[in-house]
Amino acid sequence: MFIITGKKITTLGNEVYEFMCRLYPNLTEVDIEVIPTDLTEDNVFGWTMETDDQHEIEIHNDLSEKDFITTLIHELIHVDQNVRGLLDDEEREKEAYSLEHTLTNQFLNKC
């Protein structure tokens, strides 16, 4: 199940999720909740937390549309990594950063 709060980004968030599920079928195996929140003080655009099969993505609530897409893609890659059991932080970030812009462009070009 995929839940995203915040009316402004619900449709876009669902579109990104559906796009990513076609590439990362593991995403359909877990519950994911996306929560827009002010992350200014944390100096990040987003992060992912895992509890059992529940994955919570907090994403900064004042991003441009493209930054929102890129950040959600990045964090959904982390959810897939959690499902795959990839725990090494350096490898996780290397993979997510290496794919986020390519996947963002693929998503934007399909629209």
Model-derived regions: residue spans:
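Hydrophobic or amphipathic, alpha-helical segments that drive membrane association/targeting
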Residues: 2-8, 32-41
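Zn2+-dependent metallopeptidase catalytic core
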Residues: 8-29
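Hydrophobic (often cysteine-bearing) scaffold residues that line and stabilize catalytic clefts
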Residues: 12, 69, 92
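Catalytic zinc-binding patch centered on the HExxH motif and its immediate surroundings
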Residues: 35-56
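Membrane-anchoring alpha-helices and their flanking helix-loop junctions
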Residues: 38-41, 82, 101
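Short pre-active-site segment immediately N-terminal to the catalytic Zn-binding motif
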Residues: 53-72, 86-87
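Catalytic glutamate of the conserved HExxH
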Residues: 71, 75-79, 83
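Post-HExxH zinc-binding segment in Zn-dependent metallohydrolases
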Residues: 88-111
